[in-house]
Structure formats: C-alpha cells, structure tokens
Amino acid sequence: MSYQGKKSIPHITSDRLLIKGGRIINDDQSLYADVYLEDGLIKQIGENLIVPGGVKTIEANGRMVIPGGIDVNTYLQKPSQGMTAADDFFQGTRAALVGGTTMIIDHVVPEPGSSLLTSFEKWHEAADTKSCCDYSLHVDITSWYDGVREELEVLVQDKGVNSFQVYMAYKDVYQMSDSQLYEAFTFLKGLGAVILVHAENGDLIAQEQKRILEMGITGPEGHALSRPEELEAEAVFRAITIAGRINCPVYITKVMSKSAADIIALARKKGPLVFGEPIAASLGTDGTHYWSKNWAKAAAFVTSPPLSPDPTTPDYLTSLLACGDLQVTGSGHCPYSTAQKAVGKDNFTLIPEGVNGIEERMTVVWDKAVATGKMDENQFVAVTSTNAAKIFNLYPRKGRIAVGSDADVVIWDPDKLKTITAKSHKSAVEYNIFEGMECHGSPLVVISQGKIVFEDGNINVNKGMGRFIPRKAFPEHLYQRVKIRNKVFGLQGVSRGMYDGPVYEVPATPKYATPAPSAKSSPSKHQPPPIRNLHQSNFSLSGAQIDDNNPRRTGHRIVAPPGGRSNITSLG
C-alpha cells in the first residue's frame, strides 16, 4: 500500500523577506543586488526593488548570499544489524539547516530481496512526517531479483525517483557481479536514471577480513587494513569501464582515496561521463585515527570505503575538487552511537559503518578549499549545491539564486570562526569526527522555503515542514551528451558479401571436455616418470647393432629439396 502523503502536519508559512546589501554568489557569476522572497520563491533580484509594505528586511551588509546547500549522500534512520542510525529525519535535517544545507537526498536501503517500492514508501513516510527541510530519495538496489525491472520503472515514472545506487562490496549481502552491473547499468540508462556506485572490491575485502581476523587483529584498524585504497581504486576503474561500454553516466559516491580520485580524473579526460563525490570526512580528516588507543574514538571513524591513513589525502582531494576533477561534496551522514559501535568491540567487521558530516559539510569545504585559496566563491557554490542540482535534475529550482527558484537562501559569513565540537552540534551522537577543528566560514542566516529557520545561532523548525521533491528522468546535464554520443559512436557492422566457401565440419562433442586426471587427483593411475639416467636403462650404443650388416651410402649434400626451392610467403 503506497504512502498517500502527510495529513494535518502544518507546513511553514512563508514570510515576505527582503535581503538588502548582499553579494549574490552563483556558480557562474557574482553581483551586488537585493533579493525579494515571497510564497517560498525568489520573486525579484536587483536594486531599489519595489516590494509590499510590512516586509521583513535582513541586512546582509555586503556578505555573501548563496543558494542553500544540497547534500546528496545521507543515510538517516539507516538499519544495521537490528539497529537504526542515531539521527532520524528530524535530527538529521535540523542539523543540516544549521550548517547551511537546505535540501538532502537520502538513501532508501531495502533489505536484500525485499521490494524496492515497499521500502521507498516506508522511507517516504518517515521523511515526510519528520523532515525539517526539503528532501528527495535515492533507492539502493540491494539485490537483482525477478521483478526488479518493473519496480524500477514505477519508481522512475510514477514516484519521482531518478537515481539508484548499486554496490560492488558487501559480499553475499548487497554486492552485484559484473554481469549484474552490466544488466543494471543498461536498464537504468534506458530509464534515464543516474547510476550511483559504491565502489570497493567486495570479494577481496572478504578475503582480507578473514585473514586479518585470523591474525588476531580485531580493532577498528582492521577495518582500514582489510580495505586498502587499491580495492577502492580497482572497483572505481571497473565501474567506469562497465559504464563506458554502455555509454551511460556513472556517479562514484564517497571518494576516499588518492588512487580512486586519480582514476576518476583520468577517465574524465578520456571522455567517460563519470562524476566523483568526496565527502566532508575525506576532505576534513583522515584514517590515522583508526590506530587511536581509544577504541571508541577509533570506531567513530569507521565508514566504507575507509578514510585513508595517508594524512595528505584530504589536501589532495580538495585540490582535485577545486580544479573540477571531482564535482560534488556529500556527507555520507550515518552516525551510530558509541554503544551501537561497540557491538563490534571484538570484531571490526561488526562495527556499524558511518560518520557524521551533514552539519559540518559546508564549513569544512569552505575552510579547506576557499580559505586556503584553492577555490573561489563560485566554485564553492558549485560543489556544495549547483553541481548536485544539475546532476540530479533539480536545477534551476534548486542550486541557484534566480527569479523563480525556490527561496532556499543562505547568508554566509566567510570570516566567522567556528570550533566544531560534539558539545554544540545538533546530531544525536556524543562524538564528532571533526572535534576541535577551528574553521573559517559559517552561515549567519538560513532561509528554507522562504522562511527564516536559523538566525543568530537559533534554530526554529518543526517536524514535517520539509517537502518531498520529485525528480524527472533524463537530466539534461548528463543525458544530452549521452544522446549525442549514441548517434556519433554507435556500433556499426561491416557490409560484405556472403561467404560461400567450404566450412569445416566440427564433430558433435560436448563444449567442455572432461580434463585428464592429474597427479594430484589420481596418483594411483599416474604412470611413474621415465628414467632419465641412461646408466640405469638397457639402451646402449656399444657392441653389435642390429643394422651392422646393412650396406651404407655415402652422404650427399642436398642443394635443393625435391620440387625445387619453396617460398614461405606463397600460397600458390
């Protein structure tokens, strides 16, 4: 039974707002102008605007006015081993708004073999009744079963879902084979969907986990040791290769290592439509914490793919983000409490995976990229909002300050200092992986659907005020190029006459012959090796020989063989 939408849950009442004296920052331009908001939309942009009386005025005083952030990688209320992630849709979206994010795309994670449609309705209802900001939903394909194609069609055509995640890891749980990935990519391309990939080599991870546990390593460091970055990079390369054969766009989630990022950057230079998403954690911290003597601290960083133990990785990923080789920043927000993480205290494979970042994402990106001079303000807007809106077909409704766009607006103070700490964050967990980090850049005012939801450090939201935002298939930012490439690079056979020559008759035998028994499998039937020591054999060249009485001819040197000399290159 499908969820019919929330009942008697009041949406926020839009205010008439005038933002004066701000500097509008979009991904492609900046300008000084006032912005008038009404009925949840941006109505006017310019100077000396004529607005109705009684309008609330916000003085920006030259500060940046940017589109609200879009976090396309969250796992609120995700189930794991009978537990649920600590932040539900209320707590998670509340934290998002405080950090300047005004829309999320959350992952629906069905139990393997269960209905995608049923799971979607379950997530939709939970988000609709609790979310404080606008949201949409990815649907993860956790198994490739009979009937999945029909459900995917319904989700795309009737439910407003245009993005699906597949897994190359989690052997015997979520993992798909290469042939299944090929089938899924082909089918999803036909639907005009965005294909998200969790890229890790699940087969090798399973072997490494077994080996490391047998060595007696059970702590969080085992998580990183069993998932070296080569296994992420190999899977990224494989996913891009499969997508390239089909000519479909592919979006790599949670880029955590230099190797994986390099493969994405190189592939983009060669032409495949691939997009890479580092998360706040991989940009703001590293995997050296897995070796902390404090088990709870080490476990807090457990996520997959793991954070790189190389402390230079965050700076490297930030540089690739700044130059466009990586395009979007997510958070991968899926925190579990310390008590929940402790389920794996004696076995690192049982530690629930996930870190925080939904509140910290935009501040971390500003501090690591813009405040260091790697990235300008326009690029900041692109990687935190606009690129995501374009890829997932939300643009220009989201991701832009323009007349007609949704009134999701942030007044950003680039000079504001903020120390990240679990004592003041809005997440329900008692730790923060960015604990003690002092960052430049933070929102002063956050406006969602035309109403002020965060101002002067105070959050003012209600459960259920967020809206589900449906997304249409075939986002132009991706599929415009796909359509052209289908025409230009389509496969064509060679026009030739029919072959009418002889055809060898192949005997009707089984395709695969039974292999001969080996020494290991049938030692009793195997003959002893021949004797190579001539002293132990009855073979001799001394004494009388059987042909001693035959007449012998004098040897002659053959100048040319019978029939004359041959030419090895001649067939005549």
Swiss-Prot record:
UniProt feature, compositional bias: Low complexity: 513-525
Tissue distribution of the protein: Brain.
Phylogenetic classification of the source organism: Eukaryota, Metazoa, Chordata, Craniata, Vertebrata
Keyword Cytoplasm carried by entry: yes
Chief localization: cytoplasm
Post-translational modification comment from the UniProt entry: Phosphorylation at Ser-522 enhances CRMP1-mediated alteration of FLNA ternary structure and FLNA dissociation from F-actin.
Cellular compartment(s): Cytoplasm; Cytoplasm, Cytoskeleton, Microtubule organizing center, Centrosome; Cytoplasm, Cytoskeleton, Spindle; Cell projection, Growth cone
Phosphotyrosine sites (modified residues): Y504
Motif (Required for interaction with FLNA): 246-247
Protein name: Dihydropyrimidinase-related protein 1
